[in-house]
Regions:
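Catalytic alpha/beta core domains of metabolic enzymes, predominantly
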Residues: 8, 118-188
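Conserved, mostly hydrophobic/aromatic
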Residues: 18, 35, 43, 92, ...
Length: 188
């Protein structure tokens, strides 16, 4: 329960939308206005971006997060963004409603332990080649440290196909629901 009648896991469709990365104020303002007009109450966007290439844009950082939070708060939209390091949790805490653990950090056990000691929901994305059991184990790291507000995310896995980045494993969704009481979301 994120407050303001926003819930995940209550059987209703919860839409979380937004850009891959938070780049500038104009982008955020336009996206916030569009999402709000559609009735979407949760916006995701990366301010720290783990990239395959060291030359790619790696995010707008804490300043981008502050701007992102300011725009979303004014519109009553909750914020989801990726945390990549334990040290970032305290910096980000007041601006984030849901901490996201991305695929590249799915097995970062120090980060999972630290997020387990917070009182904010944690969205766990399945690792790039992660198994269902590894995703559930990641959730256990958070859970065993006291935080039961965990959302599992099927985001696709790496396969031999190169036409698209990830292959969505829809079979994982009912299996995760069968093996766990935690809410499951899909990031196509």
């Amino acid at each position: 329960d994120l407050g303001e009648n926003i819930r995940i896991g209550d059987g209703k469709c919860a839409i979380m939308a937004g850009p891959c990365s938070i780049e500038n104020e104009e982008q955020v303002e336009k996206t916030v206005a569009f999402l709000r007009a559609q009735g979407v109450r949760m916006m995701r966007g990366g301010v720290f971006k783990p990239r395959s290439s060291p030359y790619a844009f790696r995010g707008s950082g804490i300043d981008g997060l502050k701007m992102f939070a300011n725009s979303c708060r004014k519109a009553g939209i909750k914020i989801i963004t990726e945390v990549m390091q334990v040290e970032q949790i305290d910096q980000m805490y007041e601006y984030v409603d849901i901490f996201q653990v991305g695929a590249r950090n799915a097995l970062n056990f120090n980060l999972l332990d630290a997020l387990g000691k917070t009182d904010k929901p944690v969205l766990l994305k399945r690792g790039m080649s992660g198994t269902i059991e590894e995703l559930l184990s990641a959730a256990e790291y958070v859970f065993s440290n006291g935080n039961e507000q965990i959302i599992l995310c099927e985001r696709g896995i790496r396969t031999y196909e190169k036409a698209y980045r990830n292959t969505l494993d829809l079979n994982a969704v009912p299996i995760l629901k069968e093996k766990s009481h935690l809410p499951v979301v899909v990031d196509p």
